[in-house]
């Protein structure tokens, strides 16, 4: 987050999220907030964890296998971010690169 000295009354939040897919996975969050204004509300947060086994169990009880369940949860996590990209060309390019349907 960058807040110029003229950007008073700015409200900003930076969030880093990650899914840890195996025992060797690591997630290093490094928030970067450059704030040059006095009257602002800016903060940051970080969250990480493995896939929810209850969610995998639920999807498997609905007919998906373990791999399909895991893939569906990961794609949902990725789509949450990708869908916020406003440029259609860039959004579709990223979807194509990570194998998500348009």
Which residues does each predicted region cover?
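Active-site gating/interface segments in enzymes
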Residues: 1-102
């Amino acid at each position: 987050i960058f807040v110029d000295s003229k950007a008073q009354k700015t409200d900003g939040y930076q969030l880093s999220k990650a899914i840890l897919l195996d025992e060797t996975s690591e997630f290093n969050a490094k928030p970067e907030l450059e704030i040059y204004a006095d009257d602002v509300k800016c903060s940051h947060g970080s969250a990480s964890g493995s896939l929810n086994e209850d969610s995998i169990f639920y999807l498997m009880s609905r007919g998906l296998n373990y791999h399909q369940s895991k893939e569906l949860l990961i794609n949902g996590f990725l789509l949450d971010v990708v869908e916020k990209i406003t440029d259609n060309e860039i959004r579709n390019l990223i979807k194509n690169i990570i194998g998500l349907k348009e």
